[in-house]
Design a protein with these regions (language model features):
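Conserved catalytic core of sirtuin-type NAD+-dependent deacylases
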Residues: 1-240
Length: 240
């Protein structure tokens, strides 16, 4: 079994979502959709602005810095340790799966704690990458370095995309956790698995476009449903 995780799981840790009635975009408006193009056109200016604004704290950045893994994150880490969950594909950038103890993770939208070379995809923990250049360059290939978070207009890193397709094709079940299943390419992965015979299990208080093809649906927050699912699955394994 693998999992596709969306913003609903992070919301339970106090991180606001972008979409939806109480999302940040409804309150503050959508950000520019050409962020990556702006970065490519003048990376030095982009980095200069980023460094100048790094002391400012937005609602989202404050929430994400203060967030802790919730019961859903912990249950998924326990599922991995028990051999029940083989891989997590997450759309979240908050690093909470790692903090909870999960190891087999593909972060399709990047990780806020890392920097990444846009040429060779090498990644570094944010605090370990030190460069006197603006914009910073990769020590391996001299490519431009930016934060690992995928910007609007930026292609999903190829290594992450390949990992997602590989895991989807070999999954026998997909756990859909707090994802609206409307953002592509992420919403495509469970469909690929389903067409190859995998069962889909949805954990979401709300109905999604994938609900009708799910074998099981748990209409509850992840922090409530996943610990119960973990215990139920452990019981079935122990009794088999």
């Amino acid at each position: 079994m693998i999992a596709l995780v969306g913003a609903g799981l992070s919301k339970e840790s106090g991180i606001p979502t972008f979409r939806g009635g109480d999302g940040l975009w409804d309150k503050h408006g959508e950000p520019p959709m050409d962020g990556y193009q702006r970065f490519l056109e003048d990376p030095a200016a982009w980095w200069a602005q980023r460094l100048a604004e790094q002391e400012k704290t937005s609602e989202f950045s404050k929430a994400i810095e203060e967030a802790k893994p919730n019961a859903g994150h912990v249950a998924m880490a326990e599922m991995e340790r028990a051999g029940l969950l083989k891989h997590i594909i997450t759309q979240n950038i908050d690093d909470l799966h790692q903090q909870a103890g999960s190891a087999a993770i593909t972060e399709i939208h990047g990780n806020r704690t890392k920097q990444r070379c846009i040429e060779c995809s090498r990644r570094w923990p944010r605090e370990e990458f030190v460069s006197g250049e603006v914009p910073p360059r990769c020590p391996d290939c001299d490519g431009l370095v930016k934060n690992d978070t995928v910007m609007f207009g930026e292609p999903i890193p190829q290594d992450a995309l390949e990992s997602c397709f590989r895991e989807a094709r070999r999954a026998d079940a997909v756990l859909l956790v707090g994802t609206s299943a409307v953002v592509y390419p992420a919403a495509e992965f469970p469909v690929i698995a389903y067409r190859q015979g995998a069962r889909l299990i949805e954990v979401n208080p709300q109905e999604t476009p994938l609900s009708e093809i799910c074998s099981a649906v748990l209409r509850a927050p992840s922090g409530e449903a996943l610990p119960r699912l973990l215990e139920r699955t452990r019981g079935l394994v122990a009794g088999s």
